[in-house]
Curated annotation (Swiss-Prot):
<dbReference type="InterPro" id="IPR003787">
    <property type="entry name" value="Sulphur_relay_DsrE/F-like"/>
</dbReference>
<keyword id="KW-0819">tRNA processing</keyword>
<keyword id="KW-0963">Cytoplasm</keyword>
<dbReference type="GO" id="GO:0008033">
    <property type="term" value="P:tRNA processing"/>
</dbReference>
<comment type="subunit">
    <text>Heterohexamer, formed by a dimer of trimers. The hexameric TusBCD complex contains 2 copies each of TusB, TusC and TusD. The TusBCD complex interacts with TusE.</text>
</comment>
<dbReference type="InterPro" id="IPR037450">
    <property type="entry name" value="Sulphur_relay_TusC"/>
</dbReference>
<comment type="similarity">
    <text>Belongs to the DsrF/TusC family.</text>
</comment>
<protein>
    <recommendedName>
        <fullName>Protein TusC</fullName>
    </recommendedName>
</protein>
<dbReference type="InterPro" id="IPR027396">
    <property type="entry name" value="DsrEFH-like"/>
</dbReference>
<dbReference type="GO" id="GO:0005737">
    <property type="term" value="C:cytoplasm"/>
</dbReference>
<dbReference type="InterPro" id="IPR017462">
    <property type="entry name" value="Sulphur_relay_TusC/DsrF"/>
</dbReference>
<dbReference type="Pfam" id="PF02635">
    <property type="entry name" value="DsrE"/>
</dbReference>
<comment type="function">
    <text>Part of a sulfur-relay system required for 2-thiolation of 5-methylaminomethyl-2-thiouridine (mnm(5)s(2)U) at tRNA wobble positions.</text>
</comment>
Length: 119
């Protein structure tokens, strides 16, 4: 089976991309265990706890990221450069455990994937 990467690169709640990506990720996990999840650019904000989406009349789907472990989705990476550019660091508490990687290491991990879906 092919290895599938889910890349979250958009901020939460501005569009439905993050929620749709999470739904697709959880659905795909029922079909394969060979999944990798990447958070890059503004996608790093998907993992911040304590968001208030109701203020912009959006659904709070961020807590659903906590289910990744229950779905045996364990390969999660977050771009260290994206964290720094946004004033965050690897010590920031996130809703899931994601391993910080520099851009070159992130590209190597992505290169190991057969299919890349970006949200």
């Amino acid at each position: 089976m092919k290895r599938i990467a889910f890349v979250f690169s958009t901020a939460p709640h501005g569009t439905t991309a993050g929620r749709e990506g999470l739904d697709a990720l959880l659905a795909t996990s029922a079909l394969t265990d060979d999944l990798a999840v990447f958070f890059i650019a503004d996608g790093v904000f998907q993992l911040l706890p304590g968001q208030k989406p109701d203020a912009v009349l959006a659904r709070d789907y961020i807590a659903t990221f906590k289910l990744l472990g229950l779905y045996d989705i364990e390969q999660c990476w977050i771009c260290a450069a994206s964290l720094r550019e946004r004033g965050l660091d690897p010590q920031t508490p996130f809703v899931v455990e994601a391993t910080p990687l520099e851009a070159d290491a992130l590209r190597r991990e992505l290169a190991n994937c057969d299919v890349i879906l970006r949200f």
